């Protein structure tokens, strides 16, 4: 773990312990580039590790997949998603924290599917609730949990698939679908899962 959950929960000491341990190992192996499938790790490695001595080129897997497709190193056959409606949820630590919006959409564009944007997307995207460590704690009093609100926005697009690129978001949105009793009809898939399906 990069230490992100500890830091977001307010435990700076534990974060630094985890970060320094990771940096020591990564530097021992002279690591220059890291590809991560988690926007939380992406943000932490890219923006917080440098001040602790961890300087790496950090790439999110949607950026890497987009690059591989563009360079012709990964072929997407399409067809698997022909006629499917996909909506994309922007993870906070990928989008608003690091301005990565186009790479995941470029990947979805290569599928034979239709991308339907939610009313709150890109810079105005709504958090699924996991970014504030909500998935690790009990519900708080209020009108509605944020992951339910975000799931409702996704369902407004009448999707077959809700795509994202964050394991935390995928969990929160899957839970939201179960809450709305839509988990049998609508699936939550990571961008990498979509590409894996389309390249078989």
Regions found by a protein language model. Name each.
Residues 1-200:
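Iron-sulfur cluster-binding electron-transfer modules in prokaryotic oxidoreductases
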């Amino acid at each position: 773990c990069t230490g992100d959950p500890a830091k977001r929960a307010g435990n700076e000491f534990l974060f630094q312990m985890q970060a320094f341990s990771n940096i020591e190992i990564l530097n021992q192996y002279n690591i220059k580039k890291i590809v991560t499938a988690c926007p939380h790790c992406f943000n932490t490695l890219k923006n917080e590790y440098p001040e602790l001595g961890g300087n790496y080129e950090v790439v999110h897997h949607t950026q890497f997949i987009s690059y591989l497709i563009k360079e012709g190193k990964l072929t997407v056959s399409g067809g698997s998603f022909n006629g499917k409606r996909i909506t994309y949820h922007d993870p906070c630590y990928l989008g608003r924290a690091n301005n990565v919006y186009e790479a995941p959409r470029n990947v979805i564009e290569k599928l034979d599917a239709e991308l339907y944007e939610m009313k709150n997307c890109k810079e105005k995207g709504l958090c699924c609730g996991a970014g504030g460590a909500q998935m690790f704690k009990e519900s708080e009093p209020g009108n509605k949990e944020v992951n339910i609100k975000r799931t409702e926005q996704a369902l407004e697009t009448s999707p077959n698939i809700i795509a994202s690129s964050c394991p935390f978001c995928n969990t929160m949105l899957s839970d939201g679908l179960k809450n709305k009793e839509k988990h049998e009809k609508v699936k939550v898939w990571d961008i990498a899962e979509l590409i894996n399906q389309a390249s078989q």
